[in-house]
Amino acid sequence: MFDYVKRMIASIVGRNNHEVNKEPRIIKASEHGIDPKMVSFAAVRTCSILQQRGYKAYVVGGAVRDLLLGVKPKVFDVATDATPEQVKRAQRRAFIIGRRFRLVHVVFGNEIVECSTFRALDASGVRKDASGRVISDNIFGEMWEDAARRDFTINALYY
């Protein structure tokens, strides 16, 4: 199964990992085999509410990896083009956390969905203190930029 996931990722990102593709590759449900019943109600509801308000919202990262492997994820993260303030207004129980990386925790019972805004590649707007320490880098961007700046290819998968 792991080899299947590796082959799928290689087909998505191609062989040249240095090239950034601005257009997402959409894989049909019949091809990726993710069982939607394995996605938590809280993650589905978080995405649905944002999408109903006109925002893009996707389950992202390790949860997508686990879903591809047929394993029920323990944690669900959502990436969106809504700002933290917009997410907070849209969701009933949502709390903005963090200073440097502003995220929103959306609470459903005992489950927390971590919701982040797509981040930009361009760091020219990053504010630093006198010692060069980054004070704030909440520079929002497009989905392709968010995918390109993630630390591992697997974290750049959106569902």
Task: Tell me what each language-model feature is.
Residues 1-159:
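Catalytic cores of the polymerase beta-like nucleotidyltransferase superfamily
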